Amino acid sequence: MENDAGENVDLYVPRKCSASNRIIHAKDHASVQLSIVDVDPETGRQTDGSKTYAICGEIRRMGESDDCIVRLAKKDGLITKNF
């Protein structure tokens, strides 16, 4: 919901599963969120860029979370296409 100034005033903004696009409910204690950061190859330090993936508990229960993370990382260019 937005106020008159166009600012977001919701107290709770639900997350969506990156793999299935389902809403992750507040009581889904099996869900995980992974943040993968960009690293400078020379210094080994974190740069400003990062990518966040949220996986719902239903995907994890089926045992498909590793395949989903690899598919999403390939799509974003974090992993080579022939991995």
Swiss-Prot record:
Transmembrane segments: none annotated. It comes from the Eukaryota. The keyword rRNA processing applies. One of its GO terms (biological process) is translation. The keyword Ligase does not apply. It holds the Pfam family Ribosomal_S21e. Gene3D superfamilies: 3.30.1230.20. GO terms for molecular function: ribosome binding; structural constituent of ribosome. InterPro entries: Ribosomal_eS21 (IPR001931), Ribosomal_eS21_CS (IPR018279), Ribosomal_eS21_sf (IPR038579). GO terms for cellular component: cytosolic ribosome; ribonucleoprotein complex; ribosome; rough endoplasmic reticulum. Keywords: Cytoplasm, Developmental protein, Endoplasmic reticulum, Ribonucleoprotein, Ribosomal protein, rRNA processing, Translation regulation. It is found in: Cytoplasm, Cytosol; Cytoplasm; Rough endoplasmic reticulum. May be an associated component of the ribosome rather than a core structural subunit. May act as a translation initiation factor. Has a role in regulation of cell proliferation in the hematopoietic organs and the imaginal disks of larva. Component of the 40S small ribosomal subunit. Interacts with sta. Belongs to the eukaryotic ribosomal protein eS21 family. This is Small ribosomal subunit protein eS21. It comes from Drosophila ananassae. The gene is RpS21.
